[in-house]
Amino acid sequence: MKVLQEKILNEGKVLSGDVLKVDAFLNHQIDPVLMQEIGKEFAKRFKEENITKIVTIESSGIAPAVMAALELGVKVIFARKRKSLTLQDNMYVANVYSFTKQETNEISLSRNHIDENDRVLIIDDFLANGQAALGLMSLVEQSGASIAGIGIVIEKAFQDGGKKLREQGVRVESLAEIASLDNGTVTFVQQETAEVK
């Protein structure tokens, strides 16, 4: 997705060979026009899949998930990382290791909002080692719902998450695939190398 790649090049910051900071438009400050385009692109790619619900994880997956849901005319349910006083019982639960935060979180979805009749599109902001996506897949599988695919805003293709998911036969659609962050430079898969400011 060209507009997303341009945004990464213009506003993203490479912090290391593993970490790309995109808080200027995706996971802290949100660019709603970009999110709208991302939502349209996910909807276009998954329109034939009869999606009934989108599942994501708080908090950075919510904006792209809501925009895709708006385009598809479905609801979004987001997995919580923290326990809520109002959501105690009747939950699907999985453990997810965060590459960025270097910690394990227990994530959960209410059983009241997803069931075996749902066809789910999972959406998240990043795909690195695949732990968040695998955790979300576990929650969806616990509900008995089927998984139509996974939509990723930015995939770090140099890490093994995408490979793990695709080897399981899951359809993964990434809007920007990064081949490398070496030397402070973003290199997209099948794209020219460009310097990040």
UniProtKB/Swiss-Prot annotation:
CDD domains referenced in this protein's UniProt entry, alphabetically: PRTases_typeI
GO CC, any one term: cytoplasm
Signal peptide region: none
Localization per Swiss-Prot or TrEMBL: Cytoplasm
Stored Pfam families: Pribosyltran
Residue sites binding xanthine per the record: 20, 27, 156
Gene Ontology MF, one: xanthine phosphoribosyltransferase activity
Catalysed reactions listed for this entry: XMP + diphosphate = xanthine + 5-phospho-alpha-D-ribose 1-diphosphate
GO terms, biological process: purine ribonucleoside salvage; xanthine metabolic process; XMP salvage
Repressor keyword on record: no
Pathway: Purine metabolism; XMP biosynthesis via salvage pathway; XMP from xanthine: step 1/1
Function text: Converts the preformed base xanthine, a product of nucleic acid breakdown, to xanthosine 5'-monophosphate (XMP), so it can be reused for RNA or DNA synthesis.
Protein name per UniProt: Xanthine phosphoribosyltransferase
Organism listed in the record: Bacillus mycoides (strain KBAB4)
